[in-house]
């Protein structure tokens, strides 16, 4: 078998996770967020596995066009909207919805001639202060969109949470109250909930939920695990041992000689490194799963390899599988060791890592 790393994507896990989220939000439609190459799982892979989703959320127009070219006919929404007037005919021609969050987008809609109107989701800044119109701007912007012949009616309404992944933080309730007060009585769909909203704030679920990371079997909350919500990891990042060697006490290993063995042991070298997207800053003790057990990374992660301490009595051999994260070793656990979030790990794999449906 090829010793180089691969990301094995489970179609059944993706489908299980979609079903679990529907169970969490039975009255809501699901806008499956597949931006950033399906969170590193492969854009078309994910969309084809989640064909029963009600729509797909994307960050960029080229992602939406790739889905249309791949035969996806479901509703598509550009979560950051469009950035050039020349994008608008493409939205019309490919039946792609757009978020409007900035006055420049509103002006382009008003000034462009289109063959038919575009479906718009008006983004309200309810407190994240990143994208969206403030409550003070909202009524004027809404009126201009209503008057614009290039905008399909009704206008849909959305916001995004800043702290929904902190279940004890009341700021999410503040944001919900602001959004609901501002949009009360208006027609159109409403969408507030991301993964954390769908899982932890049921009152936010609205007409559509927009799960991202949870679809891939990962909890959005630090210290939590997707399995606690009936979610199954969709990605298994797998490589192999390409060397097994005896190592003497008091001898270092790796660049910089930062780790020294306290006793005689056996080391394994795994064919994955920062050139594949595995973080160079993974500290000593970060776990890797080899032959049914966790073994710690020792020494510095290099471009193509990392080293693990297999233990004095290890029977592991060259060619044995090494799981960097997956069902047996949750990516949330690995991220916590490294001091990052699971989102970053799954989306930063480089093109050297083969992504394949398993």
Swiss-Prot record:
CC per GO annotation: cytosol
GO BP annotations, alphabetical order: D-alanine biosynthetic process
Disulfide cysteine pairs (residue numbers): none
EC numbers on record: 5.1.1.1
UniProt entry tagged with the keyword ATP-binding: no
Pfam families: Ala_racemase_C, Ala_racemase_N
Pathway in which the depicted protein is active: Amino-acid biosynthesis; D-alanine biosynthesis; D-alanine from L-alanine: step 1/1
SMART domains: Ala_racemase_C
Needed co-factor(s): pyridoxal 5'-phosphate
Positions where N6-(pyridoxal phosphate)lysine occurs in the chain: 35
Entry GO MF terms: alanine racemase activity; pyridoxal phosphate binding
Reported function: Catalyzes the interconversion of L-alanine and D-alanine. May also act on other amino acids.
Protein name: Alanine racemase
